[in-house]
């Protein structure tokens, strides 16, 4: 949900499916993760192709739902990544790439939402940030694709322009107004002014 506003990309670029569907985000749907067919069905509904990357997330590395999803994605030619807390698992073997941060035993045995889940979230942040950098959605280390949809984000956009170009706050605000709050366009406009190419 944070990738489109942070990097200015379509919400279709990064999508998520979860065993049990959207309802599972607020209420446990017991047994939903036990179906390989459901994992495949949910990815089929997303129309996965060879142009996609599918990341299967499971701390144990044995979740049938994830196995089904990765199997379907692999058959469609997608790049498959297993993100698990254990090495040498069925999910790891089902994927082309395995990422298995070694977090050690949980504080509460079996409660993988703690260390394993936290490590997986960090890995997902690394994957998404790296992808957006590679796609040019970042200038130096500034998130120039950010959608300036509220006051806080607009102020951030102004700061980015000031830091990246040496423009004053007034110049940055004016540049944003002139281009309809499109931060990358304002950045190019101010860079040309600073380099003497004109506006």
Residue ranges and their predicted role:
Residues 1-122, 131-133:
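Glycine-rich phosphate-binding loops that contact phosphosugars or nucleotide phosphates
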Residues 126, 131-199:
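Short, amphipathic alpha-helical interaction segments embedded in low-complexity terminal/linker regions
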């Amino acid at each position: 949900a944070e990738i489109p506003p942070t990097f200015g990309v379509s919400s279709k670029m990064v999508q998520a499916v979860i065993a049990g569907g959207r309802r599972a985000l607020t209420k446990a749907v017991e047994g939903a993760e036990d179906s390989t067919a459901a994992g495949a069905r949910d990815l089929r509904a997303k129309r996965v192709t060879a142009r996609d990357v599918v990341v299967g997330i499971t701390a144990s590395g044995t979740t049938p739902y994830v196995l089904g999803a990765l199997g379907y994605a692999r058959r469609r030619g997608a790049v498959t990544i297993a993100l698990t807390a254990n090495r040498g698992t069925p999910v790891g073997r089902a994927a082309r790439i395995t990422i298995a941060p070694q977090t050690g035993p949980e504080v509460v045995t079996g409660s993988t939402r703690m260390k394993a889940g936290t490590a997986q979230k960090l890995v997902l942040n690394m994957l998404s940030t790296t992808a957006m950098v590679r796609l040019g959605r970042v200038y130096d280390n500034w998130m120039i694709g950010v959608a300036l949809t509220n006051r806080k984000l607009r102020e951030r956009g102004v700061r980015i322009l000031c830091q990246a170009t040496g423009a004053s706050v007034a110049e940055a605000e004016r540049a944003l107004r002139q281009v309809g709050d499109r931060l990358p366009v304002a950045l190019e406009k101010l860079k040309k002014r600073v380099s003497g190419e004109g506006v």
